[in-house]
Amino acid sequence: MIKLIRTNSHIQYNYAQKKAYEVLLKYSDGVLPIDPFRIIKKINNIELKTYTEFAKELQKKHPSMSIEEIKCQFESDRGFLKKKGKKKYILCYNEEDSIYIIRWTIFHELGHYFLEHLKEEYSYIFCDGERYNEIKEKEANCFARHCSSPLPLALYMYVEINNNNLKLLDLFRYFFNMSKEVSEYCSNHFSTHWKYYIVEKNDNLITLF
């Protein structure tokens, strides 16, 4: 198995964005809002499970524990990605969350998958483990932001189609099916960095949708 080793503590925002657009071009069906469930179905080595489904599997090995007791041991209240053998993965999400949170969670965990965070070997340059985890979380969030609402497409829709009639926050909520919280997160980033997304290399992405 190839292990990736980080040589610095830089957050690879550009790489996460680039990878998100590559994933959309390869796996998306070009329909809005972008459906992470449909993307996962096209990835052969990821098994998608709810928290309850995964807890029931684990209960077979730990029959003395209840489903809820097992869930309490999960590393996150939202979702997580785990390796299963050498080449397969399990992506679990909390089915009790709203559909908005579930979608974001899956995009986020797909970020960990496509950015190969689970293949990384711990590097001693990260003496602070919290900093190392923070970097990976920010990269996964960056991937999720661009994969769930590709900003070159948002810019095109906002300027060319919408003609600025719809508020930016509402554009993210209605066209990309995001919660108010995530819409604010994406629209704030968009407002600050929108000029960065006016480039011809994104034409294929816009054409896809």
Name each model-derived stretch.
Residues 1-209:
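Active-site hotspot residues in diverse enzymes, especially metal/ion-binding acidic/histidine motifs
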